[in-house]
Every structure is written in C-alpha cells, then in structure tokens.
C-alpha cells in the first residue's frame, strides 16, 4: 500500500513492534517516522508496546536483557504523548460508531483531532482510518 507523507503522524503500537522485529514493513515505517515533522501517540501506545515486548520475551523471541532499552527506544520515536483521558470521549464515540474497541479508537481519535496520518500495521484499523480521517 502506498502511504502519503504527512507533517503529523500518529504512531500505533503495532507499527512500533514491526519496526523492532525488523518486519518487511520496518524500513517504510521508519522512513515515515523520520520524515514526519511531529510524531504523536496516545499514552496507551507505550503500554501496548511493553505488553508486546513481554509476549515476545515469553515466547523466547527476545532476551530479557534489553527489553527496557527497547521500550525506551519506542518512547524516543514519539515527540508528544497525548494523555488517554483527553481522547476517551471521542474514542468512545468512534468505537460505538465503528463497532471497534475503544483502546484502538484512541489512535483514530488522536489522528482525527490532529489531522494526522495514522501509521499502523493493523490492516483493519488502517481500513477504519480511511472512513474517519480526512
């Protein structure tokens, strides 16, 4: 899929994890993050990344040593973390409208509020973004 560069980018946890795993999408995702003027994320993103790191470590795909460093690198990708409480009302409305979980709609709410591109590896969330983002 071709992505349009944006001055503002909302980064979701799935994209961060793909970059850490060196997936086929990693280079494209990194380029979009580097070229964005501002990278934003809801507060939840770091918790979701931490949970993904735990799962990868638990499955034997990552060593325990270095997990904190990986989480720190995830945090360093973002210029501004938006508190979830500032997004919850809009995320709930989107969740009800789209029939999609509130925690994922936090990303959509932030992207919509900031007129930003959503960078995600979640194909369903990306499809929903086309319905609600400019």
Predicted regions and their residues:
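Acidic, PIN/NYN-like endoribonuclease modules and their adjacent C-terminal/linker elements
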Residues: 1-8, 108-134
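Active-site neighborhoods of divalent-metal-dependent phosphate/nucleic-acid chemistry enzymes
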Residues: 3, 76-119
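Acidic active-site catalytic centers that drive phospho-/nucleotidyl reactions
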Residues: 12, 104, 122
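Alpha-helix capping/helix-boundary segments
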Residues: 15-16, 45-46, 87, 107, ...
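Phosphate- and divalent-cation-binding pockets in alpha/beta enzyme and binding domains
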Residues: 28, 48, 90, 127-128
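Short glycine/serine- and small hydrophobic-enriched flexible loop segments
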Residues: 51-58, 112-113
């Amino acid at each position: 899929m071709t992505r349009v560069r944006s001055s503002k980018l909302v980064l979701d946890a799935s994209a961060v994890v793909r970059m850490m795993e060196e997936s086929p999408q990693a280079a494209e995702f990194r380029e979009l993050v580097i070229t964005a003027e501002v990278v934003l994320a809801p507060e939840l993103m770091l918790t979701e990344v931490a949970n993904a790191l735990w799962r990868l470590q638990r499955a034997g795909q990552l060593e325990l040593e270095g997990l904190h460093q990986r989480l720190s690198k995830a945090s360093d990708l973002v210029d501004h973390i938006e508190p979830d409480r500032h997004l919850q009302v809009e995320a709930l409305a989107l969740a009800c409208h789209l029939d999609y979980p509130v925690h994922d709609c936090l990303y959509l709410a932030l992207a919509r509020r900031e007129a930003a591109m959503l960078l995600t590896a979640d194909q369903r969330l990306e499809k929903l973004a086309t319905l609600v983002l400019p």
